[in-house]
């Protein structure tokens, strides 16, 4: 009996302490579970509320009324509806499918057929980059013309260059024909006036622009070369590199019509070239203007200088026949291999030069009006 009494004396305090610890543990566990549950609920409900907002906007607004995000090319002209719109397209030609970006100024669908300017980018560029550099869409929005930006495929050239030089294999001619296919598509679907088409380009794009004008002279009213090389100067990649360094010059302009027959008059040519261009030597600009003038029977006039504000000085030489310009050479002092007057934030672009985009459009517009 004494053992039972001693056992109960020790057991009762132990049981009480154990019961107290158990109750405290249960209470703490419940509190922890409750706190964790509340936190989990908050984490689950917050994303649901955030996801519900854009979903509600999509349901509330029909797809036909939603505005697509502007591309970089569209943004260069402004992102509001009054600044025009950029759309993508694909044209099939002898060189395969070629994508393009098309800029339409405000009211393009309601207006009469509009002039079309074809802009061909240089190496290491695409349509968006070239549009951002030149800001031609902004000018098109105010002046009222369409701009098509064809894009070279990397499978055709790993550097994104147009293969303007590869006439030996015929690849250059196929790419030129694919550009024509894109122009035809834009004229048929988007209201471009086939009688008012001009083509311009930078570097490799300038060289392809000139090739287009010699293959399809009846399709263009004007052509502009910025830092490019004249057709007939190169026939392969090796000779193209030599031409870029000024070690080759065309003896005569090869006018090889895609459809055969007699050659019509070449469209007037604008050449813009920088005196500090170390990639495509300045002599190429001289050669392009001279060979074009020779093919047109035009003679050079006296050079004149033009400078606006703090921009680079320009020396202009016009080549005329019967009072009409066949070629105009604009040599920009201090300009390297870059679009003159382009956006300062873009590569291959120099904001200190005269505005080449305005020069190109003004030149094309004069030809449109002269032939109206």
Predicted regions and their residues:
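A domain-start/cap signature at the N-terminus of enzymes
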Residues: 1-116, 128-134, 142, 146, ...
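Active-site glycine-rich loops that stabilize anionic/oxyanionic intermediates
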Residues: 114, 122-126, 335
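Cap/lid segment of the alpha/beta-hydrolase catalytic domain
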Residues: 151-174
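Active-site nucleophile loop of the alpha/beta-hydrolase fold
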Residues: 152, 224-233
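Alpha/beta-hydrolase active-site loop
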Residues: 168-190, 211
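Alpha/beta-hydrolase fold nucleophile elbow
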Residues: 191-203
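Short glycine-enriched nucleophile-adjacent loop
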Residues: 206-218
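Short beta-strand/loop motif that positions the catalytic acidic residue
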Residues: 271-273, 277
């Amino acid at each position: 009996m004494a053992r039972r009494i001693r056992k109960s004396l020790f057991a009762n305090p132990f049981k009480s302490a154990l019961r107290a610890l158990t109750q405290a543990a249960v209470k703490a566990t419940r509190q922890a579970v409750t706190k964790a549950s509340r936190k989990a609920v908050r984490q689950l409900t917050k994303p649901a509320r955030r996801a519900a907002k854009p979903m509600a906007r999509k349901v509330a607004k029909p797809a036909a009324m939603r505005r697509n995000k502007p591309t970089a090319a569209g943004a260069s002209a402004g992102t509001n509806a009054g600044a025009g719109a950029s759309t993508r397209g694909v044209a099939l030609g002898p060189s395969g499918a070629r994508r393009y970006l098309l800029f339409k100024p405000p009211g393009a669908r309601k207006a009469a057929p509009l002039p079309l300017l074809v802009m061909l980018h240089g190496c290491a560029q695409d349509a968006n980059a070239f549009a951002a550099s030149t800001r031609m869409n902004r000018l098109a929005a105010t002046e009222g013309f369409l701009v098509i930006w064809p894009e070279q495929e990397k499978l055709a050239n790993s550097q994104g260059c147009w293969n303007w030089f590869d006439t030996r294999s015929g690849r250059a001619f196929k790419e030129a024909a694919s550009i024509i296919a894109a122009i035809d598509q834009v004229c048929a679907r988007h209201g471009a006036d086939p009688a008012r088409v001009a083509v311009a380009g930078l570097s490799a794009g300038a060289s392809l622009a000139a090739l287009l004008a010699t293959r399809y002279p009846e399709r263009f009213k004007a052509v502009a070369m910025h830092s490019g090389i004249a057709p007939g100067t190169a026939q392969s990649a090796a000779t193209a590199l030599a031409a870029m360094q000024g070690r080759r010059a065309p003896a005569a302009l090869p006018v090889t019509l895609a459809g055969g027959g007699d050659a019509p008059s070449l469209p007037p040519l604008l050449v813009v070239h920088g005196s500090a261009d170390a990639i495509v030597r300045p002599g190429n600009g001289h050669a392009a203007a001279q060979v074009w003038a020779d093919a047109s029977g035009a003679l050079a006039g006296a050079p004149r200088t033009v400078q606006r504000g703090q921009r680079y000085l320009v020396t202009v030489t016009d080549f005329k026949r019967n009072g009409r310009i066949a070629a105009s050479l604009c040599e920009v002092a201090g300009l390297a291999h870059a679009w003159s007057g382009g956006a300062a934030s873009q590569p291959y672009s120099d904001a200190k030069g005269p505005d080449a985009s305005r020069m190109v459009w003004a030149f094309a517009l004069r030809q449109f009006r002269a032939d109206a």
